[in-house]
């Protein structure tokens, strides 16, 4: 039996970004987990905490102080320098931006036990495509070895973007640096177009099988009811939202034959996609993906459901076999209060079991409505319950929109902190509303 046509991660990944109001400590965790959907743009005044205290749960159902965190910002609210101190070790993270708010370099410094000297430990370096925001065309991850920066092979990569004479993207190839000056192609996306249209009529996604690239997914006969003409990347919710809507396509498969994709616009950002099989032997199967907007705060529910008729007849809504439901809720401040992933079985959607989840509770106690406390619970699959994870208390808020804060960085480091910065590997784009496909994010 065939499993899901497309993974939920690929289908949803590009919609996640960060709410600029979420505490700095939580931004890193939530973005890395890709569980945050884009929130509204910030107001002109950016009140940010220059200090946060992290507490962790203890065995007495209380909280124990874990570490102190200090920040300076640029005028856009991006973190210039973060300094964390848990009483045993200090960690400073400094990063530079380009004029578009894209992360250029990020250098991490740490102290050794018993010392207050911050020494460089690792560094990340990016370059970007000049036309597609946040699409890194190179990434280098380096660590200190014998006092010298050394690339960490297997983690560094480059992307080669090819365009036609009309400026449309025809292919993007990601290649991994696996040895000095040696790259191996890992994934490749190809797009074709008709006439002068900027909306693609075909899309192919290739992955490496060790020595060569082979086709993993191929979509042809793409028909759009509306398109912004902007680069959309891999198959995702971007194909059905934000001014784009793919009405139909054919998915080519050597194993399953042609799969017909038809989409219905439900209005207000909601849509439904049904995938059915043309092969007679697979008529008993189909897949339905639904994206539902739940309110004006950005809350949504996404479901990917697989139907299978055990008698071999055409699959109907009564033949639910398995699936996944992801629900993300936001409060009136556009901050996430719940992310929950549930597994669906033949027992029905109403009996779906929680597989993963994050729940946040905020205290908006600042003079200008700033978050002064955030308490987070993570779902424990073994305990089948939400368990306390962390508490962040923020204070000493500054209006960073009035100007850029400056910090002094060790001059012997490879990169001097003369530009704009961010925190702990988190790329905070200048525009909080941009979306980029998972297949192409670093």
Each language-model region and where it sits:
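A short, compositionally biased
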Residues: 197, 268-270, 412-417, 432-433
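Residue-level detector of functionally pivotal "anchor" positions at catalytic/ligand-binding pockets or at interdomain
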Residues: 389-390, 395-427
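Bacterial Sec-dependent N-terminal signal peptides
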Residues: 1-27
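Buried hydrophobic residues that stabilize the cores of well-folded domains
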Residues: 21-405
């Amino acid at each position: 039996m065939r499993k899901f046509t497309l993974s939920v991660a690929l289908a949803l990944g590009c919609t996640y970004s960060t709410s600029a109001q979420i505490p700095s400590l939580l931004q890193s965790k939530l973005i890395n987990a890709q569980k945050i959907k884009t929130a509204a743009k910030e107001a002109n005044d950016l009140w940010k905490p220059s200090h946060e205290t992290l507490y962790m749960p203890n065995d007495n159902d209380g909280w124990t102080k874990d570490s102190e965190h200090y920040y300076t910002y640029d005028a856009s609210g991006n973190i210039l320098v973060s300094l964390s101190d848990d009483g045993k070790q200090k960690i400073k993270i400094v990063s530079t931006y380009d004029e578009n708010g894209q992360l250029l370099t990020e250098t991490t410094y740490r102290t050794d036990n018993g010392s207050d000297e911050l020494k460089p430990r690792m560094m990340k370096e990016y370059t970007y495509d000049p036309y597609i925001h946040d699409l890194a065309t190179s990434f280098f991850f380096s660590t200190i070895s014998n006092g010298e920066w050394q690339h960490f092979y297997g983690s560094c990569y480059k992307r080669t973007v090819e365009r036609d004479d009309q400026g449309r993207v025809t292919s993007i190839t990601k290649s991994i640096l696996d040895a000095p000056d040696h790259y191996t192609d890992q994934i490749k996306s190809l797009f074709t177009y008709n006439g002068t249209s900027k909306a693609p009529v075909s899309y192919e996604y290739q992955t490496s099988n060790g020595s060569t690239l082979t086709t993993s997914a191929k979509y042809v006969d793409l028909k759009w009811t509306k398109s912004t003409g902007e680069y959309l990347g891999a198959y995702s919710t971007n194909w059905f939202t934000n001014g784009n809507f793919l009405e139909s396509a054919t998915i080519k498969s050597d194993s399953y034959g042609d799969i017909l994709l038809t989409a219905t616009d439900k209005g207000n950002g909601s849509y439904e996609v049904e995938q059915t099989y043309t092969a007679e032997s697979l008529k008993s199967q189909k897949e339905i993906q639904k994206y539902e907007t739940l309110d004006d705060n950005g809350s949504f529910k996404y479901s990917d459901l697989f139907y299978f008729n055990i008698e071999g007849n055409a699959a109907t809504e009564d033949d639910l076999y398995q699936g996944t439901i992801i629900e993300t809720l936001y409060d009136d401040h556009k901050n996430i209060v719940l992310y929950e992933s549930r597994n669906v079985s033949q027992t029905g959607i109403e009996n779906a079991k929680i597989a993963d989840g994050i729940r946040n509770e905020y205290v908006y106690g600042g003079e200008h409505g700033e978050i002064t406390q955030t308490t987070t619970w993570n779902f424990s699959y073994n305990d089948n319950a939400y368990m306390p994870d962390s508490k962040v208390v923020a204070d000493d808020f500054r209006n960073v929109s009035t100007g850029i804060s400056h910090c002094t960085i060790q001059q012997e480091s490879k990169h001097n902190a003369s530009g704009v910065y961010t925190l702990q590997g988190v790329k905070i784009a200048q525009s909080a509303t941009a979306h980029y496909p998972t297949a192409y994010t670093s």
